[in-house]
Amino acid sequence: SGVKTNIGIVGLDEDARRGDCASTAGNQVFTALELAEIAGLSTGIVTNTRITHATPAATYAKSVDRDWENPSVMPAAAIAAGCEDIASQLINFERNLEARYPGIDVDGIEVALGGGRREFLPNDPAANSQDARSSVEGDRNDSRNLVEEWAALYPRGDYVIDQVGFDAVDAATSENLFGLFNESEMH
């Protein structure tokens, strides 16, 4: 965004206070990704870290704590105050941007590729991916499966977890691509 901010927060200016949900209001900054989206351009995020890590998250999220990647690491008071975890903000980017700036109509992020699958899946072995390395891959304690939510929002999109899935994507018919290639960072 190019705007002065404080250590430990994402997508907010220096008037936001770490851990204080109330300080989010009025302190959101425009990001280059948001400006491109509003201009009608295709947008994307590609990283080799967790896609919810502070650096990639700064393109799409507004959080008073860079560590709030899923609700299991958020204080109950923050959740009760309406703070949204970073993974959920990625899935809800289109809706959140349109709500923040009434009158705009965007089509959402076309490409999001990285690691951090655990931030999007519920803490339930039934939600594990085919290549899960942990007995329980997801960390979310709110029972939400954000991969399924993304698929419902973008039915003409593709979700991939590996090279085989990525190579099988038909760019001529796929409108969105969401790839989470590891539970955490990609090594």
Question: How would you describe each model-predicted region?
Answer:
Residues 1-187:
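Surface-exposed loop and adjacent secondary-structure segments within mature catalytic domains
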